[in-house]
Amino acid sequence: MKRLYFFLAVLIMVSPVVVSAEEIIQKGEILTLERCVAIALRQQPSILAAQGNVDVYYAKKGQAESGYYPQIDASLGYSRFQPSTVSTGTTTVGISRISTSHSFEQYATNVTASQTIFDFWKTKTQVNIAKLNIDSSKEDLRSTEEQVILDVKQAYYAVLEAQRNLEVAGETVKQFQQHLEQAKAFYEVGTRPKFDVTNAEVDLGNARLALIRAENSLKVAKVTLNNKLGVPEAPEYEIEDNLSFVKYSIGLQEAIDKAYENRPELKSIAFKKKATENSVSLAKKGYFPVLTGNAGYSWAGHEFPEGDGWDAGLSLSIPIFNGFLTKSQVSEARANLLVLTANEETLRQSVLLEVQQSFLNLTDLEAGIPVAELTVKMAQENVEIADGRYAAGVGNPIEVTDANVGLSNARTTLNQALYGYKVARASLEKAMGIR
């Protein structure tokens, strides 16, 4: 029984911890944008993969540092020898006389140690390359995090836009429902023709279809947000509405300077470039000798233990000719450095373009929001005028339809502008390498 308990305890310790979606997000919880970002940074598989890549380079650093330490090996040997039988003559009756030698055993044990004494800093250079690759992988991890944050923000704001559009669609249905009831009342008392009723019914049907589409758009937006959070099976929850307009003030040149200073992709390729420069130096060290110290101790004999002895010495390995291998390795490292230098410039240009585009999009949307707000205000006035004219008997149903559709479109356009501005700001922040 004790063995069973011990086995179960070990199994629990080594088994991966599986966290359910309900443990991450509580049903009915109201999530802020910051909370969503925190969940994604913990749950997104892409971040786990990038972190794993960092761990890989830490392991490679450990491999490179192994050159600083002595290398110790041991071997054990056992052999049994059985000589062949040999004939030594014949007896008087013609029978061969056979003699045999005794078998014997051989034991051998060896322990050897070697230590690189001086290799013209090859090991040190390899360790430096590994450290630079670690730094580069950390920046790649940060780049992955920045992309995850942008994806979460886009999905978060898309849910808010879909919620507001659903509200618009619902209110439009209510407005056309009221208009239908009004048209029926006028028709029943004979002040309006049947056309007004059928026209109102068509408007209501179209509004209900728009409501269905808005409901589906919200569902799609929510499952998309769940995916970006890394919690696809998340329970039902709400999110805080922060879609309102807040001006973001920054100049184009300041944004460009921040991008050149902060972008993890630029830092990553800079570390890769330094690592490649070290690789050129490492390849050149193939021309130089390596001084190694070695020592050994051995036992050997027919019985264990028997004879023993030790040895110690120095060896100097001098490369004389290796078929131009070192020369080709140096050429390869230099070519890789040229490739990285060109890629670095390409990346800088891409970063500049990304900042410029994001800044211009932000500026354009900022200018459009006041216009969209004014359009909503004017559309509301049109609805009031059209409803008043129809109620007074001087308007027609087409005016009411046009006014309500115009208001719905204006409010939807405003929602799109607010969403676009938030996403443009998030894109600009990502382009600048800030959160």
Residue ranges of model-derived segments:
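Sec-dependent N-terminal signal peptides
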Residues: 4-13
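Acidic, low-complexity, intrinsically disordered peripheral segments
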Residues: 6-7, 22-27, 33-34, 82, ...
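Periplasmic alpha-helical coiled-coil/stalk elements that build and connect Gram-negative outer-membrane
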Residues: 21, 31, 144-258, 358-361, ...
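Bacterial Sec-pathway N-terminal export signals of envelope proteins
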Residues: 21-77, 83, 116, 233-277, ...
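Small/polar, glycine/serine/threonine/aspartate-rich low-complexity segments that form flexible
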Residues: 23-28, 75-115, 238-252, 281, ...
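A glycine-/polar-enriched beta->alpha junction
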Residues: 38-48, 55-70, 99, 103, ...
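Amphipathic alpha-helical coiled-coil segments
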Residues: 49-64, 144, 148-167, 178, ...
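Transmembrane beta-barrel architecture of outer-membrane proteins
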Residues: 106-108, 154, 199, 290, ...
